[in-house]
Amino acid sequence: MNPGTTNFVHGFPFVAISLGLIYKKRPVLGVIYNPFLDYLYTGIKGHGSHLSKNKNPPQKLPLSTPRPLPSLSQALIAVEWGSDRSQTVAGSKAESFLRLAGDPNHTSPVKGGRMAHSLRSMGSAALNFSMVAQGGMDMYWYVIAHLMFAPLYEGLLCAGK
């Protein structure tokens, strides 16, 4: 999972160290740490997820009760361009992001547009997932341009079923 290497090189403080533990083919533990902000996200199967900020006691996630999300037009969505900027990958992502953010009712409409409230790119997949867990973002729109690798990505993300 992208920890925000480019962010680190540029001194942008959205960087993470992320670890996941799978036991008997099941995710049981996840840890994401942002050393610049001193935020530690933890998730332990059967014990929930927590955020510890600046050495303070852990807070249960999400930090606030999630509000109902009736449509994408009210959603704050995390997206990432990634490091593969080939025509195939960048083109797939650009098309997906355009449909996600585009206005289908504009005088120059975006075909298939869903008019999401806003898209954000933090530069770290690990922190995007953390912000969703925290309640700071509504979802992470993860585009896999090469679908033949989808099972591999599932394992890398410690995804459960």
Regions found by a protein language model. Name each.
Residues M1-K161:
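IMPase-like, lithium-sensitive Mg2+-dependent phosphomonoesterase catalytic core
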